[in-house]
Amino acid sequence: MIMKELEKNYNPSAIEEKLYQKWMDNKYFHADAERGKREGKKPFTIVMPPPNITGQLHMGHALDNTMQDILTRYKRMQGYEALWQPGTDHAAIATEVKVIDKLRKEGVDKHDLGRDKFLEACWDWKKEYGTRIIKQLHKLGSSADWDRERFTMDKGCSDAVLEVFVKLYEKGYIYKGSRIINWCPVCQTSISDAEVEHEEQDGFFWHINYPIVGEDGRFVEIATTRPETLLGDTAVAVNPEDERYKDIIGKMLKLPLTDREIPVIADEYVDKEFGTGCVKITPAHDPNDFEVGRRHNLPEICIMHDDATIDCKGSKYDGMDRYEARKAMVEDLKKQGLLVKVVPHSHNVGTHDRCKTTVEPMVKQQWFVRMEEMAKPAIAALKNGDLKFVPESFGKTYLHWLEGIRDWCISRQLWWGHRIPAYYCQECGEITVAKSMPEKCPKCGCTHLKQDEDTLDTWFSSALWPFSTLGWPEKTKELEYFYPTDVLVTGYDIIFFWVIRMVFSGYEQTGKCPFNTVLIHGLVRDSQGRKMSKSLGNGIDPLEVIDKYGADALRMTLITGNAPGNDMRFYWERVEASRNFANKVWNASRFIMMNMEKAPVHEVSLDDLTMADKWILSKVNTLAKDVTENLDKFELGIGLQKVYDFIWEEFCDWYIEMVKPRLWNDEDSTKAAALWTLKTVLINSLKLLHPYMPFITEEIFCNLQDEEASIMVSAWPEYKAEWNFEQEEYAVETIKEAVRAIRNVRTSMNVAPSKKAKVYVVSENQKLLQIFEHSKVFFATLGYASEVFLQSDKQGIADDAVSVVIPEASIYIPFAELVDIAKEIERLQKEEERLTKELARVTGMLSNEKFVSKAPEAKINEEKAKLEKYTQMMEQVKARLAQLK
């Protein structure tokens, strides 16, 4: 085999696109159900959370997809028929907003264009921009089966949506009714809770007196943040246990600014300790009030049009914008002497994440899914162990949502999306739900039917994603083999909006939980811990990182130190450290391959291996076992850290340095063993690193093996009992400890590596001395020793020799010939003076209350870090001075 020499420097941009195309051309990402069955393979399936076709790759996508890719590559190498099912989401409102904006710039109005032409424009937009994020995922190295790419509005997914809607309607689980929903007055559609952003805003509590009917001069005082909704009040509620108001329960109140009277009702929803203990109930404009209203059969009076202007015929406020009406009503209350006081108050306000308009809760006729029965199997799944969360604590979040679940509003007043398959008879008004337009009304026989104008919530089709992408409702071979899927990787922010809905949909439609594990990750925040956002201008483009440092460096940065479920901070320094690690791997591989070119690598017997060879082989063997366990437990960050530590420290810093004399000596009888060990350990290390850093490992592996090989379809390293060398591990770890101690002493004494020194090792442990006897070469090459003396006592060792203790031995190094003691003491004393001044300065700053209260947090942390650093340096200087004196 002729090896291709690696380039001198690792250049990710020169190899990544080429390698990705190679993987695609060879269909390495493709999973085949028939092949899997034929070859007796176990399936492994992950469904990609479908990114919006409006989206661009952000750090959240990068983290989410890197985690999925790691698991898929790992299982593929283990011999599973691994399917990572990709696709995109039609993102109803997000896409509609984009297309409306594009048309507006062209001078075209959505409604003037008409529904059919507008949908054509949406499909054109999808064709032009919809694959952008997929191409960006390619750059990340995602090994999804792109031949199977799906779209939530493709024919298969659309057929699944129709099937489910009709089934649920026929079972009575889907109904049309009036309930409270989130309404966007600008987009003029209902929106999901996921599309509502809650932010704290400064506002007011307006305290208003409601007169008690028939009792002149007696009032009930309420406090509200939204006085304009007063027009829709249908009751005032008090807590039944509140002694202050027991005598007025059941009495009528005169509703200010109207000619209506409303009752005082008792409901435990009211918190006696909050505000006045009296709550105005507006069932049509508040979710909690809606529930109270339903319990007490209160009227639901909607007082707003779809554009959030007041709808109150005959009133002076009719047609006013809600905020204009607020001002006018407050002024009128003041004039009538009913405004008691206005108190500043901060409260959460819901805004639409698309247009930033304040969302209006409204009771409207919409389509809903009845959730009580459908939630039961989803609750049981977690409790009986069919479904688990990593971390486990997120199972509580899941249960909390399910046990308090409300009926799901699934209709949207949009054009882009799955149109609701309900047809209205224009003669008798009968509603028919069917997969296609009925020829005639089943009730009256009229042939004039009209389809519902609304479309379905995007999450409706997303809820079917794990099985609709595999061909359901058809009984396909893919569905039979790959379903249920194995793991879902997603963020904690969509447990309710997506995870729960997939679980209950899976049970309802297939009788199975759609996945057995949900691996939760947190958010990627900026270096200050802030959420990345356009408004803060702190977003970091993953593609910018990839272009500058390579995909592997970004992937490593996102996974290192990233624990499941926790948010992580993004630091450019970590990206640079990841790039440096890639360079370390590249340079070590290049060194090994250059030596392999000079002498061919032959298979050797384990008996031919030296102590150092057996040590590193045993270490990589244990590493394979540990990393396998970590990946099986979804401890991705821990596994990567172990691979990093092994390659950088054990393999590069120790083993390669240990074997260099053998490689450079053609007469050394153990050279063949060294080369075989280097190649074997390198290949195993690359395989363990591959799921995390696929590009660099592929490039090195192909050059190490042959051009046609691919590491991604090679076998995952397995633990081998014959590679377990406990004695050699103990011996080399002991040598490392001794060499490390010698290096530390030399550094503390400021002795250059070029200056060789005698080393005395004193120990009563003969076994230890025997280990050192066979390792004198390491003391010379790694510990810069001119000579090594092994003895059981201190005889012949100079009194001024510097000593250091390691387990069961003492090491002495006479430095008198190498170091001018007087000059070294003088240097250290000057350093002590400098550090004393620096410590005084930093301590003074940190004890200054003015500085601490006004300085930026980053500056304070910087000074704290200096204090810690200078304190450690001072301790070291004092210890060295004590040694020398």
Features from the language model and the residues they span:
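Short Cys/His-rich metal-coordination motifs, predominantly Zn2+-binding knuckles/fingers
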Residues: C187, T258, C355, Q426-C428, ...
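Feature 926 captures the class I aminoacyl-tRNA synthetase adenylation module centered on the KMSKS loop
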Residues: H207, H400-F460, L464, E508-A551, ...
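Active-site-adjacent bridging/hinge elements
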Residues: G40-M48, I70, L103, G107-D109, ...
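Short, polar/flexible loop-turn hinges at active-site or ligand-entry regions and domain interfaces
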Residues: K105-E120, K388-F389, L543, P564-E576
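Structured ligand/cofactor/substrate-binding pocket environments in proteins
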Residues: G60-T72, G79, T88-D89, C157-A160, ...
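N-terminal, positively charged nucleic-acid-binding surface of large information/translation enzymes
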Residues: I2-E241, I265, T282-R295, P299-G314, ...
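Short acidic-hydrophobic surface loop/beta-edge motif
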Residues: W206-V213, K251-P256, G350-R354, Y423, ...
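Secondary-structure transition/capping motifs at alpha-helix termini
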Residues: R73-E81, K102-R115, K135, K139-A144, ...
